[in-house]
Amino acid sequence: MEVKARAPGKIILAGEHAVVHGSTAVAAAIDLYTYVTLRFPLPSAENNDRLTLQLKDISLEFSWSLARIKEAIPYDSSTLCRSTPASCSEETLKSIAVLVEEQNLPKEKMWLSSGISTFLWLYTRIIGFNPATVVINSELPYGSGLGSSAALCVALTAALLASSISEKTRGNGWSSLDETNLELLNKWAFEGEKIIHGKPSGIDNTVSAYGNMIKFCSGEITRLQSNMPLRMLITNTRVGRNTKALVSGVSQRAVRHPDAMKSVFNAVDSISKELAAIIQSKDETSVTEKEERIKELMEMNQGLLLSMGVSHSSIEAVILTTVKHKLVSKLTGAGGGGCVLTLLPTGTVVDKVVEELESSGFQCFTALIGGNGAQICY
């Protein structure tokens, strides 16, 4: 049997950094996906006593005997309950880390270890100790702020949960899960994100699982329904950033200049709320007029992010290039590098701006904003 699943990446449309200080932020799914294929061998097949993980886009393969996994991971039949998502204990995580170490990851790929640990945890908790080959490939650049780890957790969990769906209820082509299974999927994916990030907000996995857009403030997540098409150019600066240091820097600036930074955060809050209202609006306002308002909000948001100290010369280079083509851009996520969003109004031809950006060493993607969440296929 073969099961496929896919889950989208995400962008922060407005509110990054300020959300840590009580402001509203808006995030959206993008139509760049992580794909997971789950293949179960026939009982008579060779290697029906192994669990194999293939990372296609980085040409790596890992394989464990089921006997070794059972030996390493404490097994209690009562903990295997796909309908009750559970956290990975420190003890179990240490045991899983040993399994990962035994695979002799290349030094330059050690950043993959937490993702592989997450794979082993989710697989054994949801499926148990059954043989399979799991193939993962992704359209999302790793570590660029587009939610690649959450998309992995969501797509993997979707495939694992889908493997036990009755054949009678299976559809043809890509199909979404029902609300009950989506909620279960999102909870399991969040447990996976905790292994990778420690204390994630839950935003990335929620956007990836449900798709479309969400608004979040003070820990509360509200799903939004977009009523207008949005297309963005996403430019990866290829500059790595230290998210923790950037967040800390904004907090320190807020301590030094409390009144000024409070005004900045309040302004960002207003921008996020207005953006959410425009996107959800069902009034007769033309798409062109809405796009103009969104352009202005993005421009203001970028100015406020600059005042927080989280921009970077690479981000400013992208912005200057897109301005020459009469396009508006803002950083997305932590800043300090990472990715930049450029709004593409209806009818925009991007060939020339993409050519100019790529000639400067940047990586470009065009993406539709607010699309489908996790989907499965048989």
Curated annotation (Swiss-Prot):
Extract the GO molecular function terms from the UniProt entry. Answer: ATP binding; magnesium ion binding; mevalonate kinase activity
| Entry binding sites for ATP | K10, S138, G143, S144, G145, L146, G147, S148, S149
Which PROSITE patterns does the protein's record reference? GHMP_KINASES_ATP (PS00627)
Query: Where do the catalytic residues lie?
Result: D204
Report the enzyme's class at the first EC level. transferase
Q: In which residues is Mg(2+) bound?
A: S149, E193
Q: Name one GO cellular component term.
A: cytoplasm
The reaction(s) this protein catalyses: (R)-mevalonate + ATP = (R)-5-phosphomevalonate + ADP + H(+)
Q: Where are the transmembrane segments?
A: none
Q: Which UniProt key words apply to this protein? A: ATP-binding, Cytoplasm, Kinase, Lipid biosynthesis, Lipid metabolism, Magnesium, Metal-binding, Nucleotide-binding, Steroid biosynthesis, Steroid metabolism, Sterol biosynthesis, Sterol metabolism, Transferase
Give GO BP annotations, semicolon-separated.
isopentenyl diphosphate biosynthetic process, mevalonate pathway; sterol biosynthetic process
Q: Which SUPFAM superfamilies match?
A: GHMP Kinase, C-terminal domain (SSF55060), Ribosomal protein S5 domain 2-like (SSF54211)
Coarse class of the primary localization is cytoplasm
This protein's pathway reads: Isoprenoid biosynthesis; isopentenyl diphosphate biosynthesis via mevalonate pathway; isopentenyl diphosphate from (R)-mevalonate: step 1/3
Cofactor(s) demanded: Mg(2+)
Q: How is its activity regulated?
A: Its activity is inhibited in vitro by geranyl pyrophosphate (GPP) and farnesyl pyrophosphate (FPP) that bind competitively at the ATP-binding site on the enzyme.
Coiled coil ranges: none
Name the family the entry cites: Belongs to the GHMP kinase family. Mevalonate kinase subfamily.
Quote the protein name from its UniProt record.
Answer: Mevalonate kinase
